[in-house]
């Protein structure tokens, strides 16, 4: 299972040439076919529905608002803690996409989960497009993503997570677990 984030590192990869089941985040449907699309933002759900995407996952509290067959509930978190970053409402599409993948498959490949800004600016292939911030905006604080994705890795110790990124990308120390590995994009 390939789980696709929207970091700039994946911008030169032709996702249509990767032939395996895919979970993607938000606007990735604009560029390639995704089997399962995760949208935690209502505007993105509406865009995906307008595009006719057949399988959209969103927050349970919003899925029923759409009353539309392809819109499904995201899975519940395995555990909920007491911190703000443990609250399901504060989980974004990226961490939820990895969680969904872990429920579906025991071998997860991840691409486009760059986390960090570039020159302190937004790091997203869809910057400057509908529903996204300007590429001139400051980088998003990545601490919630690091924490939440680390939770998924620990909740699924029998699942293998292989992250593909550039050679200079630093994997967060919280992700350095026995079931998580890092490889370069050319190995994808």
Walk through the language-model features, giving the residues of each.
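Metal-ion/cofactor- or nucleotide/acyl-coenzyme-handling active-site neighborhoods
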Residues: 1-188
